[in-house]
């Protein structure tokens, strides 16, 4: 086994040296420096530390090698495309992705417990549910109009719509607070009330954050003019909140 490992390592070293010499003589010193900083150093680390190549896990080690090479390639492309706009979209995208993961965790927990208890009677206040949904739907329609005005460069109406969006957000939070005050059970009475309060509480928190975003954009629109990218990001955040509410509606009120 040890002799097989050593022979494989020597074979990898021979390939590495041959490729390095060929690129050195054909392209010059810059290519050699690039190889020394990326590919060659990784090969040396792989040979010295990753001895799985000579065992039954040979293909696993080779797969890991190609995954690391692909990662280096992707990072090289990402570094060439780095700009302030790309960084902003990356941060905003990762924030949305993290929020999706948080909600998915609690939604899956509720879905799991609900399927484990198929026979269960839950009293649903449809009037309060419809009021909250109508308010949030009005906010979603208003966001769509804001994004349309931004695309049409109708910036004079954006400030007015953002102020109305802030008002809609506070109305939604008021209705949600009334619903909490009328609930007759506490958060630790049953798993249904636990998930109901946690999920709707997280959603209300995101509506509050969306209202802060709208307030900041309204202030910036009054002082600095309309900022297309920032308004678009705030609008997409509100659409994300609307999608989450649709998922909560199916789980908490219709399932």
From Swiss-Prot:
PROSITE patterns: COX3. Gene3D superfamilies: Cytochrome c oxidase, subunit III, four-helix bundle. One of its GO terms (molecular function) is cytochrome-c oxidase activity. Its EC number is 7.1.1.9. GO terms for cellular component: mitochondrial inner membrane. It is found in: Mitochondrion inner membrane. It is an enzyme of class 7 (translocase). Keywords: Membrane, Mitochondrion, Mitochondrion inner membrane, Translocase, Transmembrane, Transmembrane helix. Belongs to the cytochrome c oxidase subunit 3 family. Component of the cytochrome c oxidase (complex IV, CIV), a multisubunit enzyme composed of a catalytic core of 3 subunits and several supernumerary subunits. The complex exists as a monomer or a dimer and forms supercomplexes (SCs) in the inner mitochondrial membrane with ubiquinol-cytochrome c oxidoreductase (cytochrome b-c1 complex, complex III, CIII). PANTHER family: CYTOCHROME C OXIDASE SUBUNIT 3, CYTOCHROME C OXIDASE SUBUNIT III. This is Cytochrome c oxidase subunit 3. The lineage of its organism: Eukaryota, Sar, Alveolata, Apicomplexa, Aconoidasida. The gene is MT-CO3.
């Amino acid at each position: 086994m040890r002799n097989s490992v050593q022979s494989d390592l020597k074979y990898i070293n021979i390939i590495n040296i041959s490729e390095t010499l060929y690129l050195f003589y054909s392209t010059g010193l810059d290519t050699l420096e690039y190889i020394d900083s990326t590919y060659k150093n990784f090969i040396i680390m792989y040979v010295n530390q990753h001895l799985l190549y000579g065992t039954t896990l040979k293909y696993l080690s080779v797969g890991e090698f190609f995954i690391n090479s692909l990662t280096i390639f992707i990072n090289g492309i990402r570094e060439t495309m780095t700009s302030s706009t790309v960084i902003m979209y990356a941060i905003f995208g990762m924030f949305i992705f993290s929020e999706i993961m948080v909600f998915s965790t609690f939604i899956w927990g509720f879905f799991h417990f609900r399927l484990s208890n198929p026979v269960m009677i839950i009293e649903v206040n449809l009037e309060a549910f419809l009021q909250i949904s109508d308010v949030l739907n009005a906010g979603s329609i208003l966001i769509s109009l804001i994004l349309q005005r931004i695309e049409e460069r109708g910036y004079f109406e954006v400030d007015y719509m953002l102020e109305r969006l802030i008002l809609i957000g506070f109305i939604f939070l008021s209705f949600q607070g009334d619903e909490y005050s009328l609930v007759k059970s506490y958060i630790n009475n049953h798993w249904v009330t636990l998930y109901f309060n946690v999920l709707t509480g997280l959603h209300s928190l995101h509506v509050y954050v969306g209202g802060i975003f709208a307030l900041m954009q309204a202030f910036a629109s009054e002082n600095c003019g309309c900022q297309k990218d920032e308004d678009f990001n705030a609008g997409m955040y509100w659409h994300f909140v609307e999608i989450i509410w649709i998922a909560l509606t199916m789980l908490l009120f219709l399932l």
